[in-house]
Amino acid sequence: MTENIHKHRILILDFGSQYTQLVARRVRELGVYCELWAWDVTEAQIRDFNPSGIILSGGPESTTEENSPRAPQYVFEAGVPIFGVCYGMQTMAMQLGGHVEASNEREFGYAQVEVVNDSALVRGIEDALTADGKPLLDVWMSHGDKVTAIPSDFVTVASTESCPFAIMANEEKRFYGVQFHPEVTHTRQGMRMLERFVRDICQCEALWTPAKIIDDAVARIREQVGDDKVILGLSGGVDSSVTAMLLHRAIGKNLTCVFVDNGLLRLNEAEQVLDMFGDHFGLNIVHVPAEDRFLSALAGENDPEAKRKIIGRVFVEVFDEEALKLEDVKWLAQGTIYPDVIESAASATGKAHVIKSHHNVGGLPKEMKMGLVEPLKELFKDEVRKIGLELGLPYDMLYRHPFPGPGLGVRVLGEVKKEYCDLLRRADAIFIEELRKADLYDKVSQAFTVFLPVRSVGVMGDGRKYDWVVSLRAVETIDFMTAHWAHLPYDFLGRVSNRIINEVNGISRVVYDISGKPPATIEWE
């Protein structure tokens, strides 16, 4: 019998802040399970979840507007600790009898708050002291409205010159509100405050650890599928790789992985996937060479969105054909992770500000009545990587830069041809190899090469030649929503350019992309 790692749990009600998933990740980092729900949950749902504590997130709305989101009244009657962050503090103050007003000046960025009264939330936590010995905290503010009167049974814990109620508390009820964002690294003691709330005030044990998550997932897979056979589309990406390793540990040879080589992978990637998962780890893998099929389907197509759809459609066709060849397969495994679940829920309710379409395998033939196994659906990406390490997958594979689902299909601009893919693969491999040699790979968030379908004149020996152009792209980002182009050293870029032009016959010019996001996107297509 495995330990119940969901025994202690935090409920986070989402009011729409861009930082809400970060709050959840911080709670998970403290070893405590949490879930992220839309703000308008019912009393029955909260009772059923049975949280040890509730966090009210920030949000873009104004509590001074009549129809702005409010926490369900039951939240304040459930008898559990509450932590309101920014908008979450404002709605708590307003709903419990305080007052909120639009501020004349929007407070955004660094601020220093002075602790004026003792509170369990910040006791012994400080960044500096005032001349008369009062604790100071360096925090990150992002708000327009502010609380101008706190509920009568609350006390002021901390304030700034422009924000008289930066922290408020009702110690008896264990209700706390902060006007800043403790989840961001700019709030230097933010993690300690979250730890104080989750571990001390809510009294949650650190049960959510990689080893225990693996034990729990293995037990749940075995309980769900029993002795049945399971099929998984293995791409070699992080999510499908960790899913494969978890299933292999749980059910061994009853798992069949289908690896579709679409001809759009990185240099030697197919061989590496087959060697690692087949030869090294001993998984049962069906290798499907399908390069010709994908490239013929893409022939003549220049539109990026159309290319994506073609690649997705052909993958499903190939996967379905292989699945039908297997006997007695009852379950389809997918590497769905928690952000996918959150996005799907947001899409269904229409509450998300930005929704991207998410595609897993999907589209299986109607005659295949399969159940769905999603062992990663409670996990964030950083948790998936930690579990992968625990399962023995190599660090370099788990922490390599993101690679688009359509692969080189969207890194070859315009029509995709085998010649272009082969040139791009070799050029990109040189760029990545040089980044690693210069100890720059882990200093940038994503780096890759793009094939441009234009010829440029070059000089080779005594002759002139017209060959293709590639662009190097490297960015630095925290969340991939915005990004800066990476200021790589000139001598490094020169070395990469020389190697590509000299070693990859067919490329005569290398350029470097210095566009930020916005206005550009990270990928070219």
Swiss-Prot record:
Q: Pathway of this protein? A: Purine metabolism; GMP biosynthesis; GMP from XMP (L-Gln route): step 1/1
Q: Which domain of life is it from?
A: Bacteria
A GO molecular function annotation here is: GMP synthase activity
Q: Which residues bind ATP?
A: S235, G236, G237, V238, D239, S240, S241
**Which residue numbers delimit the Glutamine amidotransferase type-1 domain?**
9-207
Q: Where are the transmembrane segments?
A: none
Question: InterPro entries recorded for this chain?
Answer: Class_I_gatase-like (IPR029062), GATASE (IPR017926), GMP_synth_C (IPR001674), GMP_synth_GATase (IPR004739), GMP_synthase (IPR022955), GMPS_ATP_PPase_dom (IPR025777), NAD/GMP_synthase (IPR022310), Rossmann-like_a/b/a_fold (IPR014729)
Q: Which GO terms describe its cellular component?
A: cytosol
Domain GMPS ATP-PPase, which positions?
208-400
| Catalytic activity, as annotated | XMP + L-glutamine + ATP + H2O = GMP + L-glutamate + AMP + diphosphate + 2 H(+)
Q: Which residues form the active site?
A: C86 (nucleophile), H181, E183
Keyword annotations for this protein, in alphabetical order, are: ATP-binding, Glutamine amidotransferase, GMP biosynthesis, Ligase, Nucleotide-binding, Purine biosynthesis
User: What EC identifiers does the entry list?
Assistant: 6.3.5.2
Any Pfam family matching the protein: NAD_synthase
Q: Listed disulfide bonds for this chain?
A: none
PANTHER family, A to Z: GMP SYNTHASE [GLUTAMINE-HYDROLYZING] (PTHR11922:SF2), GMP SYNTHASE-RELATED (PTHR11922)
Q: What does this protein do?
A: Catalyzes the synthesis of GMP from XMP.
Q: Quaternary arrangement and interactors, per the entry?
A: Homodimer.
What is the recorded name of this protein?
A: GMP synthase [glutamine-hydrolyzing]
Organism field: Shigella flexneri
